[in-house]
């Protein structure tokens, strides 16, 4: 067998074994206050978050059903394949490079007969916590099943499109958490901390997740409101609560980046300065949320955000930004929409915005946020939803990628569509980019997004893998028209 045939044969073996993501995305890790790629270059990420849930996906991939079963996995995966294709379509101006995945609890909730054994939590009014903050119906065998058949396949799809992935646990934190719940033998195996330990043990132990820990990161929890220890919240309570989870994840073999949340819906990180979490890998950042009206920013009709005041308040609440990388995993804004709204319980007219959690303007809150982002230089971000970055319905109908709320300059869609491209291109000389070589190409193979070789590619998205004369393999995503 001559050298060329030998190289091609070796390439075929390697292509069948190698994951698409590892070849396309340099591994990331924490270096001081920054994210660094495998080439020692500073990186910040920008993209969207989303959740595999019919309701939150506006019934686009399936109509209402009473439950979620194996039969529902494929239409869900097919839908997100389109989302990932759209938000990474550079030819149409889309430049996302990170996706925050919510392992939605709708897939892992059992019936009464499958009660998880986890305890109920209660609101200040004495009512039992409901919805995503209620873990009493969590069923571990379902989580194990859909981790393999849905959540990890979604991660693989995202990686294949050049998206780093931040993974969040199912649901949201109950309103009042305490360290004592875990330290008390009567509640240890029933409390929310034990729930997180189980979730992340299954996730961090998975061989695929471990293999791609440079591209996949973990956000420990979503929006803790209150965490206390011995009745206090500023005595190391956050550290005592999350330290066991970090320690367990590392013991299970996951060495990738862990994003630690703060309290007050991910606004308060002050106590971590005095009581930092210890990480054996020194690969720790902080996951923050930022909405209009927070951190002394403006909102509503009074969005007179002062950039410097916003910046100072943000840094006061998130002082860990001086020492560690930050990812803002939820942010959005849009102004009031003329003529839209509803009447409240008292019959007063309440104006509505264009469909975001926060009401504000780009010229106020948005520009203030960009000022913080650019000044600190170590903040990544994901918009609160895919549909806040681009118009999903237009894309599904016409394959056209355009900003969400097109034409509304004061909404986050137009602004972030522009900024993500700006940030990506600026970073392309110092951050994420495909490592190229001028070595001669021995052979080129085309693979579809599912990883199957295509002999005669037509129009669409493909991963090309090229065997070089120096024995190396390089790969990249291409759009064929």
Regions inferred by a protein language model and the residue ranges of each:
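C-terminal outer-membrane/trafficking sorting elements
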Residues: 430-481
């Amino acid at each position: 067998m001559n050298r060329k045939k030998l190289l091609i044969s070796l390439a075929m073996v390697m292509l069948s074994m190698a994951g698409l993501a590892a070849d396309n995305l340099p591994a990331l890790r924490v270096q001081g206050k920054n994210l660094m790629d495998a080439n020692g270059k500073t990186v910040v990420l920008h993209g969207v978050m989303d959740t595999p849930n019919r309701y939150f996906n506006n019934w686009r991939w399936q109509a209402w059903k009473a439950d979620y079963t194996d039969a529902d996995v494929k239409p869900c995966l097919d839908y997100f394949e389109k989302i990932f294709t759209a938000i990474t379509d550079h030819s149409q101006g889309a430049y996302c490079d990170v996706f925050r995945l919510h392992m939605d609890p709708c897939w892992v909730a059992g019936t009464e007969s499958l009660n998880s054994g986890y305890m109920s939590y209660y609101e200040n009014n004495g009512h039992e916590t409901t919805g995503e903050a209620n873990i009493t119906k969590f069923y571990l065998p379902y989580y194990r099943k859909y981790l393999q058949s849905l959540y990890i396949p979604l991660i693989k799809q995202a990686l294949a499109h050049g998206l780093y992935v931040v993974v969040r646990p199912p649901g949201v934190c109950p309103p009042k958490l305490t360290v004592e719940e875990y330290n008390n033998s009567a509640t240890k195996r029933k409390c929310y901390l034990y729930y997180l330990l189980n979730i992340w043990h299954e996730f961090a132990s998975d061989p695929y997740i471990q293999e791609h820990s440079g591209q996949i990161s973990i956000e420990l929890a979503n929006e803790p409101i209150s965490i206390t220890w011995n009745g206090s919240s500023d005595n190391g309570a956050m550290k005592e609560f999350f330290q066991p989870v970090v320690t367990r994840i590392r013991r299970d073999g996951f060495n990738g980046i862990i994003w630690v949340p703060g309290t007050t819906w991910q606004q308060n990180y002050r106590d971590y300065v005095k009581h930092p979490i210890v990480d054996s890998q020194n690969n720790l950042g902080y996951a923050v949320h930022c909405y209009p009206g927070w951190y002394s920013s403006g909102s509503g009709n009074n969005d007179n955000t002062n950039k410097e005041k916003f910046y100072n308040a943000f840094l006061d609440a998130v002082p860990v930004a001086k020492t560690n990388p930050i990812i803002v995993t939820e942010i959005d804004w849009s102004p009031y929409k003329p003529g839209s709204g509803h009447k409240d319980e008292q019959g007063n007219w309440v104006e509505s915005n264009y469909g975001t959690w926060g009401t504000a303007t780009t010229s106020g809150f948005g520009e203030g946020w960009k000022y913080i982002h650019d000044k600190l230089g170590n903040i990544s971000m994901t918009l609160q939803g895919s549909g806040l970055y681009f118009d999903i319905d237009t894309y599904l109908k016409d394959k056209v990628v355009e900003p969400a709320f097109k034409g509304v300059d004061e909404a986050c869609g137009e602004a972030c569509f522009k900024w993500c491209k700006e940030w990506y291109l600026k970073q392309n000389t110092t951050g994420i980019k495909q490592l190229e070589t001028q070595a001669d190409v021995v052979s080129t193979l085309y693979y579809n997004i599912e990883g199957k070789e295509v002999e005669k590619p037509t129009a669409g998205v493909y991963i090309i893998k090229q065997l070089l004369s120096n024995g190396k393999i390089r790969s990249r995503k291409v759009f064929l028209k």
